Amino acid sequence: MSVQEMLNSVMKSDDRIRYATVCDMEGQVLGTKIREGIKPLLNDEEHREALIYAVNSMKVREKLSAKLGKNQYVFAVYDNLCRLTMPIGNKYMLLLTWGPETTLDIFNNIRNALKQT
């Protein structure tokens, strides 16, 4: 399945998802999908910086995986949004955002969408 098909599937899984992007493990964006009517909170440079930070954090977690187990996802709650980063295999990372009012049931929708890809 292509990156664009994966992004479409994830975005369709839950209307509360605002933003989805897939990048490689160097932080290079491979594809992005933004919900219609949503204005990103970060500009392109800030988004790139956030991706590099998330990728580097994921690499650190990978070093600890022998003791902690494989990283499934990282969930961060901010005042203005929630963010999930999730490895896709060993080469890619998925980053999703949604509003801070969203309940955790969104995880099941995302996981189900990724299982179909």
Label every PLM stretch briefly.
Residues M1-T117:
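Non-catalytic interaction/Regulatory regions outside core domains
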